[in-house]
Amino acid sequence: MLGVKDKGILLQIIKRCNRVIEKVSNISETEFSLNEDSKEVVCFNLFQIGGLANGLSVEFIKEYNKIPWKQIIGMRNRIVHGYDTINFEIVWRTAIESIPELKSYCKEILG
C-alpha cells in the first residue's frame, strides 16, 4: 500500500521531472552544454528529485525497485558536493532518457 507521505513525494518528483523535461525538450545537447541557465535549472531539479527520493520510505523503495532510487540519491549528492566537476554529458543523458522514464514510473505507481 502506498503511504500518504510517499504519494506526496511522488507528486513532487513528477513536478520536478516536468521542469527538467520542459527545459531540455526544445534544445540540442550542444545548446544545453553552452547554456548555463539550462544547466543550472536541470541540476537544481535533479538535486531536488534526489532529495525527495531520499525521503521515500524503505518499504516503498523495496516494493517499487524498477527505478534505481539509490543512484538518484547519489546523483543529488554529486551535484551538491561536486558541482564544479559535474559531467554535463551525463546530466544531459539523465534529463533526456532517465527523467521521462522516472516520471512515467511515478505516474504508474500513483495509478
Describe each region flagged by the PLM.
Residues 1-111:
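Solvent-exposed interaction patches of small proteins and small membrane subunits
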